Every structure is written in C-alpha cells, then in structure tokens.
C-alpha cells in the first residue's frame, strides 16, 4: 500500500507517515468517512 497521503494539498509522505496512516486507518476502522475529514488521495485496501 502506498504511504503517500495528501492532506489539504500538502504532501505528508515524509512527515510522520505512520501517524498519518494510523489516523486514517483508525478513522476508517471506526466508520468515519475520510472524505468528510479532509483526507484525500487515500486508497483503501
């Protein structure tokens, strides 16, 4: 899975990618739609 995540148009690939990924993952896990929290360009697998 690609770790590149774009938030608000800023590339966070090298800025704490694990924290960003975990935040997105937990958001999806508990049922929060990432499209409403400002996360974009995130591929769900």
Curated annotation (Swiss-Prot):
<comment type="similarity">
    <text>Belongs to the coronaviruses ns4/ns4.8 protein family.</text>
</comment>
<dbReference type="Pfam" id="PF03905">
    <property type="entry name" value="Corona_NS4"/>
</dbReference>
<protein>
    <recommendedName>
        <fullName>Non-structural protein of 4.8 kDa</fullName>
    </recommendedName>
</protein>
<dbReference type="InterPro" id="IPR005603">
    <property type="entry name" value="Corona_NS4"/>
</dbReference>
């Amino acid at each position: 899975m690609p770790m590149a995540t774009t938030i608000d148009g800023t590339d966070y690939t090298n800025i704490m990618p694990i924290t960003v990924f975990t935040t997105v993952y937990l958001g999806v896990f508990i049922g929060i739609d990432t499209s409403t929290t400002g996360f974009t360009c995130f591929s769900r697998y």
